Structures are given as C-alpha cells and as structure tokens.
Amino acid sequence: MTTIAIVGAGFVADYYMTTLANHSGLRLGGVWDHDAARLRQFTAFHGIKAYGSLEQCMEDPDVAIVVNLTNPESHFALNCAALEAGKHVYCEKPLGMSYDEARHVIDLARDKGLTVCGAPANGLSDAKRLTAQLIEAGRIGKPRLAYAEMEDGPVFKDNWTEWRSRSGAKWPGLHEFEVGCTLEHAGYGLSWLVALFGPVERGQAFSALTFPDKGPGTHSLSLAADFSVGCLTFQSGVTARLTCGLAAPRDRSLTIVGDEGTIVVRDLWDDRSPVHLRRFDRKPPLLQRLASRFERQRGRALPLRLTLGKPVAYPFPASAETLSSFPSRIDFARGIAAMADALNKGETPFFSGLRALHLSELALALNDGVGSFEPQSRF
C-alpha cells in the first residue's frame, strides 16, 4: 500500500478521485489547496481528510508520493518543495514553465534519490497497449509516419462558464486560455508518440494566437497560443505531425502509417478507444468500399467520414473498471499507480526522469513555436 497526498483541488482533481477507486494499492492520506473554501467543498464531497497547511501535507510521514495538481505556473515550486521534503512527485503537465525549470526538478530528484513522474496517464492505456502490440507484431510493417490530432473544438464559443466538476469546481477557462491548449493538452499526443517511437531527434514548431477575442473576461488577459503544430523526427526514423488547437472541430485521433498498412486510434482521450487496422494487401471493409463507390459515382464527398480499416478486438480485459466521463475517458490515477508499483519493485517508472523531462521540453517547444529545434533532453 502506497500513501499519496494530493495538492490542488481544482477541476482535474475530481478526475483523479473518480479513478483512484481502480487502484487498491493506493491510499489517499489527504488533500491540500490554498483556496480554503474549495478545499472544504472538495473534501466534504469525497469524504476525505484535508491538511491544515501545505507544511502539514509535506511533513506527513506516511506520504510517499505528492501528487501535484496545481496550476502550471505553480508546478516548479511545489515539485521542488515536495522533493526537499523527501517525497516522490507525480506532476500534472508540464514539470515547469521552462526547460530550465523542468531540468532542475529532474536533477533535484536525482540528487536526492527520489523519482518524479509526469502526467498524462493515457500513454499507459489499454488502447496504447493494443496499438503497440499491433506494431510489434508487424501488422503494418515498419511504421513511417504518424498524424496526431489534439483539437478540442471551439471551446471558447461554448457555454464553458457553466461547466462544473463532480464536486462543484468551475472549469478554469480564463486560466486555460492564458496557459494555452498546447501546454494543457499536447502531452496526450506526445506521451503516445514517445512511448511508441522513442525520443525525438529534431523538430519544427509553430504556434499562433488565432482568436485573440475569446469573449467576456478575456480582453485584459495575455492569452497564449491557441494553435500549434509540430513536425517531429524520432531517432527510430518515424516522422510525426502533432497539431493542438482550440478552434477546429474536435478530433483526438492518431493515425500511424507503415509499409504494409495503417492503424487509426479513434480517440486518445479514451483508454479503450476503438483501434482500426487496415492492411494494404487486403480489401477495405464492405461499407468503406460502398462509400468510395458512391462518392465516385456522385462526384462528391459524403457528409461523414468512415474510419479506415476494421476495428481490432481487444485481446485482454479492461484494466480499469471506472473511467472519467466523456470526453475524458482516461484512468487518470493509473500513472500514480504505475509509479508506485515500479518504486515498490525497485524499478524505474516509465514516464519518469529524463523521459518526463523530454515530454515537458517538447510541449514547451511546441507552445512557444520555436521553429527548428533539437531537444536537449535524451533518455
């Protein structure tokens, strides 16, 4: 049994509480948040302990892992404070707001013999496991190209001010617009790409603020880029394009093209997403052939797009009984559980150390639109 403490009781914290039930090896020691009213609301809803102060949380002798769910600007300071207190850290993305901050966190953990892991946990999902199995089995031959989409749709045109978490937290829209969709969400694509294809050797990054007016309350804010695209070359030879945005229609799919076929993961925010396989040496499914014939005869594209290939049946049972509600069908607590399990076995967690640093560095480069770059981090 590994005892954890959560710092930050905002919107995302309810996702962690929902999925904590999947992991009997984790015990929640308590929660702290600087907003006393929000802390009372959160702990009362979930029936859990509230720490009286951050110091009390850090000094809890039972706590092995501090889970950092604060806003991104606070990640660096809190990560360092937890490490100085002798705690392992599981941090929401990114580890810091600059490469130097993220690097300092990883170096500090190494010097103190501690471990830092980074979210998100969808890179540990059943869908990623199935996709990796298909690639390793040679079902599409050698993978050459990947397209990862992380488009959230025009969120700022939605009724986002009314969105609430299970325990009543408001969705922090204004702050999300200030931080930007890339730092918030690029990790959901990057975690898959890095897990499947290894470290990035070089890349091209572009970002822009395409909608400077995001409605009431935003006019006095310094808004971050709401669109970014990164073209990444991996040391394994794979080329990938990752797009993040807050305006184009929602699309969180991943397409991988190999010498002999394609894999399409319909939704990276769904741990059991349908995964489609198409082999170039086999006919497409009947419905896809009929759709193609109809389009040729009519000379016009259909008003809907079918996912290429046949859905692949999962050869193993679901690893989580409870997932967060759509559209975030992710076992958020799985990353913490995987970290605890590895530490208890004396192993290195997958998304820790230099790999976690690499993911933060890539997200920061995409968000900043740095142009040509070569990552400093390696693993």
Regions found by a protein language model. Give the residues of each.
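N-terminal Rossmann-like dinucleotide-binding module
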Residues: 1-46
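Short, Asp-centered acidic motifs that coordinate Mg2+ and/or phosphate
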Residues: 30, 64-65, 145
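Short acidic low-complexity segments
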Residues: 49-61
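Beta-strand-loop-alpha-helix segment that lines the small-molecule cofactor/substrate pocket
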Residues: 60, 64-65, 71-72, 76-123, ...
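C-terminal helix-rich "cap/oligomerization" subdomain common to oxidoreductases
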Residues: 65-67, 114, 313-379
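Predominantly a Rossmann-like dinucleotide-binding segment in NAD(P)-dependent oxidoreductases
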Residues: 122-221
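Charged, glycine/proline-rich intrinsically disordered loops and linkers
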Residues: 158-170, 280-322
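Contiguous beta-strand/loop segments that form the cofactor/metal-binding neighborhood of enzyme cores
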Residues: 184, 189-282, 333-345, 363-365
